Swiss-Prot record:
Source organism superkingdom: Eukaryota
Role description: Structural protein that crystallize inside the trichocyst matrix.
Subcellular localization, as worded in the UniProt entry: Trichocyst
A Gene Ontology cellular-component term: trichocyst
Primary site of residence: other
Entry similarity comment: Belongs to the TMP family.
Protein name stated in the entry: Trichocyst matrix protein T4-C
Taxon lineage: Eukaryota, Sar, Alveolata, Ciliophora, Intramacronucleata
Amino acid sequence: GAVGEIQILLNNIASQLNGDQKKADKV
């Protein structure tokens, strides 16, 4: 459903933000 798709998009955004934070921590 639409709600599930939105949750997936939010999860993708969250994972991308987490990845950016991890990269920043390494620097």
